[in-house]
Amino acid sequence: MSSDISDAVLDGDAYEQAAALTRRVFPLSLTGKIRACSAVLAAAVLLFPAITTRRELIAQLEPAADAPPALVSVVALGSAVTFLFGLVFVRQRHVVDTRTLDLETATRLVRTEDVLMTFAVSTGLLFILVPVALLLAGALSSDLVVYLYEQDIRLYRPAGGSYATTARVSLAGAVLASVLLLVEAATR
């Protein structure tokens, strides 16, 4: 590990030196950051089976629920934002690969990446992974869902007037993850 850092500082280009010398919250390569965004997007695929398995229970708990649960809209928003962050990381990698950078510019790019990754992780975590995890927990345990409703936590509360159906959002998660991976591979 320390020999890798020494090699990057002594023999690497300006970006490798900046990446080795700059303290970062997420010490991942740009490719790793792009793939992390893709993995989070792929988690949205679990939304459809998690809600479909509890269709009867949802009808009992939310009798007037014709619209999909509000968490579906949250996951849709998170998917769009996470996909955009993934594209920004693809562009960032293109900049690093095609431009000659000095150490100061490279350091600024590394810090910018870290800030962007902070937002990408928080968006993906809060808007995709947490809702999917809650809905999966509900799919695995109907007793948990009933308990949450007794505590006035309406896990399947409907979203009024939403175009984001469960199937569309699950499919969009798979498509966006695939597109991001294809763009990442094509620009490598």
Regions found by a protein language model. Name each.
Residues 63-86, 168:
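Alpha-helical transmembrane segments
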